[in-house]
């Protein structure tokens, strides 16, 4: 060891006497002798213990260090061993001089002579690596003072730790390890006080290999180890399977090659234990390949070296110097090399794949990643038990090594930095300091919230700033847990501003210099900024985890800070610039509403010159010339009554036009005008209606009341003048119905006849059937004295109503008679006969479009503002509608009706009306009605005259054949026969497009329904038509009776009309409607009759639009509107959705159907991706496709999106929704697929049979319902099904 002591700066203790025998160093990797020319001899199994004479390092060795600033000496690369079994270059012959280690930090372990006492390392934390016999478990030394566990079959003596005697010195001439030349970077020595031991003098310790000498490796696994062959003889290489790589943050890997198979391994003794050493090796050690590499080679000898189980020789354990990296296991068959590697654990590429061993988690200080997932166990038949046990011991001993490495790093910064500045500038010491900091950070972080709640917040920022990377692992907090002020401050920050302001605020956490001001600056910012910004989640999410307690405590102690940082809150410039919101010019410029010039030009109304000039009334020339009245040939020839058969069979006669005429006057003049002016005024009304949606009462009732007094005053006189044209009530005699000209056939005789299914309220009360006029159940049950008169105010609302979906369906029922009606309009002269009895207008049906009363004074009468884009109304003057059967009807009724006339109550009463009511009802005392049952019945006027809602006037003929154009439009309402759910008239308010039905007119309180048109004679009922496309219309075939007063809409019907509008608006957004929503928004105070109102609205929807209200959820009572007309063709889907969306929906529904009505979300998205549609990307057609499928279609109830139970992470599946089942069927889906694939549906046999079974089932149910409904109509009209 004198060579070691002669090195520069050698501070080792003085050499001790060493035995003279076995002077050659023990080389763990043997090279053949120089004089040997024999072929390679297989190695015998290595000795029982790879106990290299690793003497403890007792003091720093400056000889291993190079002067500061000097580059290391050039290092020759070690020749890489070839593949398994390939010949390998041998080491130089035995006895050759060993070159000085060119690379600093190389630990060469040599074997001492057998039986020589070894200096035992007194420092804990040394990893002893001993080869073992194949099959013998590998033993590892326990910590100091721990009793040893022996492997099976091995006896171990544990003598007390005597002072370790020095090992014998090498024989003369033995090449020893020389220190590197000056300037070679060496390992750092530990600071003073480090319990590291140096080898005693003369200890044959580590010898570096000769420069460029190749390393000798053992043979492959399972092959007997060859003896050291002659120099230059190829030797087999050992694959070295089962490499354990214990990685540390500091670069430096110890790769230890396991021994040859069959070599028994004896567990090393505890500290200072005596152990038998193997025979000395005479093979010189090759030069290490690189700096800082420890090469531990198994000993090789000419004969098998077998270690005794128990030995009295002390074993010398090596203690790595402070700068020495920790040990790992070398992969493949490479020499036992301690390489300075990166922190990446590299898996051995050539080791065959074997069952994965459990990961060995080394108990290391924080920051030392020691898992070895790539450690392949038991390759090539190597016993798994020794390796597994060995891993356990390594795991147990690793903490000691880490603990040893931590202290020197903290204590020796100055020495390490001065000696190894060129090579190791210092990241390793910094990394060694991190573990204690990490241990301290956690308690600081735990204490941070309470400290922030209190005033001193200083410890928190240091913990946050010193370890920012730990925050990255924490998940973002839920946004709903933020403080109230956070939610209040966020809306004022624009979305784009939040993203831009998050990074600077989030980075405040990383500034440790901010001191105690950091929490005061950062926390308020987190209150307002990083929470809603998803882009900053990667950075701000970790920092936000600990913020909820801070946020909740911020208002207490740090309220001014959010006030100091409301800059993003004070920068809601986009919100302060809601110019589009502040410039609702279209809302403030309802010029069409403010320019109801006909309404704003009531100058003729204010100039009641026509009223003051009752010249037309004083010119009863038409009354004196009652040529039409004296020509009641239609009345005297009750052709409609005598021709019921062809009308009932619907297809007997083609009709010429029948003019339903009412006096047409300008909306603001009570004077006769020319036909051209009337057309212009009608056009203006139509334009205003299109521009002005129905927002309540477009025109005040007071403006219209100015028109009424004169006519009301003239009522009694006019009635006296026309006794011959007044008709008796329908129940008092044969009612002269709509009479056609003698030469004209019935106009609408060929209207198709609708179904006779009765309508029933959800409560079980009957609605009117197709052929039976019925009043509401309440009205039928109510006595006559409970019925009230009409309200005092009345106005007409002309509205253009276009059916959005029922139009196409109803066009199919348009008779040719209407198509042939001429469009010529004539002006009816405003003579006294224009208003023969009163100024009341009673539409032919009480079911004309009756929204909320336009002239009502309380908001309750308008529960819902009818803002449907399809309905517009216009206030029109009150004029009576009287059907006018004339030969010119065909020339006057060609125009398609486009204005819906709405009649409200009128404050009118006459003696004739009172007399008419007396004929069927007991007299009632005059005055206001005292009944308070929610105004469900007509009210009684001041005169005490009360009219039932069933009492209507019959149509009255007029002498003057001229008529206006909008009375022709009104004719459509008169042709309808569908009555409301509570009135016996033909059509409901919405002009139900029911196919032809038998007309129902006046029904007396005590007469049978079959006499309502024909009187007591029991003659056949007269006819009525019902359908015109895209127009809602009322109806009445009843001839207007001058002795009876018109009645207002029932409040239930008003609410039903408003509910229809509400449902249509909701259906445009495809949003299901709940019963509670309908009650709260529309029905309101009539909630006791909510089911009745809903049933009426359902009937109106079905008759007018071909839709039906369906309940899709019985628990929440959720309803949707389903199109019945387009069921087999599934046209509703295409009409509602845009074409691309409809196609996507059909593809999704088809795939779900083919997969058994259920498909996983990921499978669906992968299928769409194969079609070229990425659901994650934003496209121009669907925006975000995933959101369209999983949100929009689900909200529309086309799809059902639910989580698959017991899935982690959560997975979802898609199914058909209730709307899909209602609007389409399996047959249609199969046809869609067949058209898509250009095949027949029969190729999918299973789905095809399933679809046929569903179709047959539905047909059977439909037939059963038809038969049941026919029985109900014949016997019990109250059994219509609930609209489910």
Swiss-Prot record:
Pfam families: MAGE. GO terms for cellular component: cytoplasm; cytosol; early endosome; endosome; nucleus; retromer complex. GO terms for biological process: Arp2/3 complex-mediated actin nucleation; negative regulation of DNA-templated transcription; positive regulation of actin nucleation; protein K63-linked ubiquitination; regulation of circadian rhythm; retrograde transport, endosome to Golgi; rhythmic process. Residues 39-48, 139-150, 158-203 have a biased composition (Pro residues). Residues 1-51, 114-208, 406-431, 673-717, 747-792, 839-860, 913-964, 986-1051, 1261-1284 are annotated as: Disordered. Residues 775-792, 937-954 have a biased composition (Basic and acidic residues). It is found in: Early endosome; Cytoplasm; Nucleus. GO terms for molecular function: ubiquitin-protein transferase activity. Residues 1-10, 406-418, 702-717, 747-758, 839-848, 993-1008 have a biased composition (Polar residues). Residues 675-686, 761-773 have a biased composition (Low complexity). Probably enhances ubiquitin ligase activity of RING-type zinc finger-containing E3 ubiquitin-protein ligases, possibly through recruitment and/or stabilization of the Ubl-conjugating enzyme (E2) at the E3:substrate complex. Acts as a regulator of retrograde transport via its interaction with VPS35. Recruited to retromer-containing endosomes and promotes the formation of 'Lys-63'-linked polyubiquitin chains at 'Lys-220' of WASHC1 together with TRIM27, leading to promote endosomal F-actin assembly. Part of a complex consisting of MAGEL2, TRIM27 and USP7; directly interacts with USP7. Interacts with TRIM27. Interacts with VPS35; leading to recruitment at retromer-containing endosomes. Interacts with BMAL1 and PER2. This is MAGE-like protein 2. The lineage of its organism: Eukaryota, Metazoa, Chordata, Craniata, Vertebrata. The gene is Magel2.
